[in-house]
Amino acid sequence: MKRIFYTLGLLLLCLPMLQAGPVTRSKAEQTAKNFFAKRQPTLSSSTASLRMDFVYKAAEREEALFFVFNRGEKDGFLLVAADDRFPEVIGYAFKGHFDAARMPDNLRGWLKGYEREMLAVMDGKAEPIDPIREAKPTRDLPSSIAPILETGEHASDPILWDQGYPFNTLHPLLPSGQQAYTGCVATAMGQIMRHYKWPEKASGEYDYYDDMTGTHTHYSGTFGETYNWSKMPGNISVGISPEEVKALSTFMRDVSFSVNMQFADFGSGTFSIFVERALRETFHYKKSLRYIHRSLLPGKEWKDMIRKELAENRPVYYAGADGSMGHAFVCDGYEPDGTFHFNWGWGGMSNGNFYLNLLNPGSLGTGAGDGGYSTDQEVVIGIEPASNEAPGIVPDPTITLYGLQHNMSDEALDLSVKIKNYSTYAGDVKLAYRLTLPNGTETTNPAVTVPIVWEDIIGESTGNITIPCSQFAEGKNTISILYRTDGMADWKELKHILMGLVNKIEVTMPAGDVAYSVADARIVLKDGSLSHNLKAYSDCKLSATVYNPGTEEFRSRVTFALRNTEGRLYFLGRHLVELHPGDEDGEKVSLTITGLKARAGQYMLVCTGDMELLMEDASWIELASIEVAEHTSTHSSLLVASNPQIDLLTVHRANPETLPTFSITNEGGATFSGKIEIVAIKAFSETFFQAKEEHMSLAQGETKVLSPELTANSSLYTNAELFPDGIYYIVIREQGFWDPIDLFGDYYYRIRLITDLSSSXIAGKDVSTIVLYPNPAHDYVHVAIPPTYAGSTLRLFDIQGRMQLSTKIRICRYASRRRTSSEGHLYRCGRRHGREALYSLIQSVNSKTDKGNAGWEIPSGHCPCTVC
């Protein structure tokens, strides 16, 4: 959840590709005239006083994004898109004025979001919304709702509050001598409460510290002053009376303190989750109101929910963030064209109708660093006064699945379940699992209880669940993770918050294969929709329509790639896919690929929703066979790499074997001369060390070989703190003028770097207690266990409490390979040599020669059992 500030606004999102052209000024002016003439034909100034006052351009580009037209002095404004791929009109108002020099900061942020979205479309990285689909009505609801805070009972005195005088006269005086602003969160809350003129007075206390300016200021007090609603005008005039100033500032002081407002000269901010608590407990609104995060709902369901609230005459508290900061405001109306009316909390300035986003649902997760913005929106709904007869019922806490890891052994499936709290609940969360056998039999099994909190940031916790393999039947077994909190009568399924509704785990027996699924949600390529110009080593584009033939929603950040017959993967791009069940229209996915790494040839187009795994460890869905054409570059050098290593290779730090070499071929039309380097890059990190550097000259068609040397920089390679054991990418690249440039083709392979067991502190034969090395460990650990522990269960947890390994300790007669996770394997050896000992080692083998009863071969000299 993002902290909301006075001076920073909401940024919407960036996304996918089309062909179109710019809109001229004259055409934009005609669009504006037609719009006002159609929507308000009786207004005399509809077209006569229309003028273009501002052209919005991208900060570092000269392209116009939209034109701003004002009508008369204060008869409304219009934002007309300067590119015909977008809706003609992207924002408008029938009263007021748009002043580019004095626009509210939150509107400025909103338009900055529009800018990023529009540039993404114009650059072929995103697709715009379809205005026809946006305008589809919500069943059983009015086609439009006039702005609640400005019409109806408020028509003669619209609610147009601000954050400065007279609302902040009782707010803290800052060290600079400036009176603190009320803050956008408090202003949005205050306007909604002014709509109801409720409560008579607040109750309870406030007690918190303000660390915004580093002064650690303590604020505490008791609520209880009676509010003089009759002296709180909606529209503040110049001649406001002292009584009105006191009434407004008393109320807004309480609102700010109720949400633990943090004050500073540049603005005041707090968390939206405090709004739910304050309205319910301090200001006596119905207990049934609730905070909801955008990522919990599909796009259409989100908009339908907001429309339903407004149809019930309930304004919606709305907030959004751009990845760092954001702004809160009030959504109080909607129109048939798919736009919503926003009151920015800036004295009425620029209040109007805007789209929630300009990008289709699948584009909403594509932002800077694939972060996205629109999905970081929040609302509080169900805001209405409580009464003794109808106080409302506190909704069940919203607990979500935030992360899931598993370990499958012969004895049990161990699950590490990370949960996140999107409510004001604080207490115990009970976790259970529902097991559905292949024959349909279901059982619900309580498993573990974990505590969770919510203060300031959303609380997180981790629970570990062990499911004995004896509970599984032959075939596909399905597991759902359930939760229940104090006061909940029934178990609820955990829904995944990370852009996907992953809530099922499938275990196939007797193989022991484990897969995650999205219930009955699938992603399938629509026949005839695939279009591309894929060419080896070139910039290219791909578009396709995917749909969901299942019965449940599919929403996940999907990675698309090419896979060759060897199993090598070539990354294409990522796209947030939001698919309604059974909707054969599906969603168009557009990808822009810069410098495709793949060679010419036949590939399989694949995708995966596994967000927390390395590409090589993910489960891939096959979509279609696809051909990559030959490259046609002849004017410059073009370096293509190849290497023989496909599988993960285990490398021992103390005695590293020779690593596979890279072949580099110049397939371009000119001689190459420059530096080539090989580096080892830590997975999930930017940490790397150099394993080779060489100045190389390659004529057209010439091939040379370069071999990595891990010990080339021994001071780094041997530093286990800087470069801990774990997975590394061995990458060959050109040292560019500014940044290194990865070669084309097969420019990397993976190794697992481990500290050699034979040189560690646990290599001796007389192990009398459990020993781990290294300790602390990062990605990899050796465990030495004396035979007296045979029959016990070994479990390893990381520092965050997540289970990484669970296995029964046994003395066996041969070395065996057992899958423990997507990261590696467990090797056990209990050969007798006068003394029994057991050593457990998680690693991948680089030799799979069949040895009969010995199972998978353990690399020579590195048997985990050092007494062998």
Swiss-Prot record:
GO molecular function, one term: cysteine-type peptidase activity
Disulfide topology: none
Active site (UniProt): C184, H327
Keyword field contains Plastid: no
Any single Pfam family the record assigns to this protein: Peptidase_C10
The EC number(s) this enzyme carries: 3.4.22.-
Keywords: Hemagglutinin, Hydrolase, Protease, Signal, Thiol protease
Signal sequence extent: 1-27
Hydrolase recorded as keyword: yes
GO biological process per UniProt: proteolysis
Entry similarity comment: Belongs to the peptidase C10 family.
Functional note: Appears to be specific for arginine-containing peptide bonds. Possesses hemagglutinin activity.
Protein name: Thiol protease/hemagglutinin PrtT
Taxonomy of the source species: Bacteria, Pseudomonadati, Bacteroidota, Bacteroidia, Bacteroidales
